[in-house]
Amino acid sequence: MLKKLSVTLSLLLITVGLLAACNSQPAAAPQPSQPEADTAPAEEAETKTEADTASAEEAESETAASPGGDLEVFSYWTSGGEAAALDALFSTYKDEYPNTNIINAVIAGGAGSNAFAVLQTRLAGGDPPDVWQTHPGAELYGRYVDPGYAAPVTDLYQQEGWLDKMPKQLVESMTAEDGEIYAVMVGIHRGNDLWYNKKLLAEHGLEIGDTLSFDQFIQMADTLKEANIPALCVGDSGIWASAMILENNLISALGSRYPGLWDGSVSFEDPAVKEAIEQYGQMLEYQNEDHAALSWDQAAKKLIEGGCAFTVMGDWAYGEFVNANLKDNEDFGWIDFPGTQDYFDLVADGFTLAKDAPNPEAAKAWMKSVNSLPAQEAFNPLKGSICARTDCDRKKFGIYHNWSMDSFASDTVVPSIIGGAAAPADWQQAYFDGVTQFVVDKDVDALAQSLAQAAQDAGISQ
C-alpha cells in the first residue's frame, strides 16, 4: 500500500574538539638514589609506548575483523555524475572495510529500465547480488519484499540510532506490513525541476524570475524557436524521461489531488488529467529532433553545450552539470516545473539487502556504511540529491542543495511513478507504454483512457 510522504527536515550540527598538552623539566645532577623528577619522563615515555602499542593492536584487530571476500553491489548508476557519486560510496566503504573486494555490478539504463529485468531474473533464479539499488514504496514492496527476496535491516536502525536521524515518513515508506524495515536510503531527489542554460537564455534576452508559469514557458519556447533553438532538451531513448514530463504536468494540473491518481480517489478521466496531457503534448512540440536517439544524460549534455535551453529532469541532472564543471546559478539555473512550486516530487535512492546474500557480513556492513554521515555527505553533493539523514551539515552543500532542502522541509511531498513509489511495476509499465504511443500520435483521449484502464487493471481505480 502506498505510504504518503509529508516530511520535515531538521539539521543537527556536531562539533568535536581535541586537547593535548605535555611538558616536563630535566633533573639536576644524578644522585645515588635518583629523585622523582628524574623518573617522571621515563615513566611517561613508557606509558606512551604502551598506549601506542595498544592503539596499534586495536587498529590491527579492527582490520582483521573487517569482512573479507567479494561484495557485489548492483545498481544502474552509469552516467558521469552518478558514477562519481557511487565511487564516493565505494571509497567510504573501503576506508572502513579494507579487506572487502567490491564488485561494481552496474547496468546501464536510466531509471533502471534495463537493470530491473536483469535483477528480477537473478532473484527468481536464486542468484542475488549482495545488495541492490532500490526505491521506497511500491517498488520496494512489490518487487522485493512481497516475493521474499529482501532481508530486513530493522536491527541496524535500532543499533545505529537511525530512527532518530531519518524523516519518520521516509522510514515508513520502507517499512512493510510485518513491521520490518527493508531498505536504507542514501539520498532524496526532487523530480519536479526545470533546468536551463542561463547564458543561452541571456543571449536571447530571456530572464526567469522566482516562478515560471506554463504560458511564460511557451512564450520563451516560441522566442527560441524563431532562433532555430529547441527549447526543450529530451533524451527519451528510455521512455521514462518523457514520461517524467507528463508526471510533472499531472502534478501541476491536479495539485493536492495528484496522489489520488495512485490510490483510486481521482480518475484518470478527470478533466484535469486531460489538461495535463494537453500541456505535455504542447511541450513536446518544442523538443529536440534527435530526442529518441539520446539518453537522459545525453540530453543534459546537449543543454550544457547550448544545443537547447531547458530540460525537465530530476536533480540527478545536477550531477551531470557539476561533473562538467558548471557552476550553480552561474552556468545553469533551475526553477520549479511550472505550477508545481508548492510540491516536492520525491524520488529516493537506496539499497536493499538480499535475503540470501552470498556475503551477508560484508553486505550488512555496506548497509551500515552508506547510511553513515560521512558517506551521505560525500555522495549527495555529487549526485544532486539531499541527504536521507537529517543531520548532514548544510555548509557542505551548494546553492541548489540548500534550495532543495528548503523545499523538502516546507512543500508537500508527493510520490513519483517514475521513482517507483507511486504505483506497482505493472502499472508503471502501462504508464510508460501509454506515453510511448502518445509521443507518436499525440492522442489525448487515447492516453487518458489507457491510463484509466491501467489503473483499473491494477485494482486502484475508482
Where would I find each of the regions flagged by the language model?
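Glycine-centered hinge/linker elements that transmit conformational signals in sensory
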Residues: 220-223, 263-293
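Extracytoplasmic/periplasmic substrate-recognition and gating elements
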Residues: 91, 95-96, 101, 125, ...
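Mature extracytoplasmic/periplasmic domains
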Residues: 77-80, 84, 92, 148-158, ...
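Hinge/lid segment of periplasmic solute-binding proteins
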Residues: 58, 65, 135-191, 218, ...
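Extracytoplasmic/periplasmic solute-binding protein
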Residues: 177-186, 192, 218-265, 308
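Extracytoplasmic "Venus flytrap"/periplasmic binding protein-like
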Residues: 92-173, 203-205, 309-310
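Extracytoplasmic/periplasmic substrate-binding proteins
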Residues: 76, 90, 139, 243, ...
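Conserved C-terminal helix/tail region of periplasmic/extracytoplasmic solute-binding proteins
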Residues: 43-52, 57, 148, 202, ...
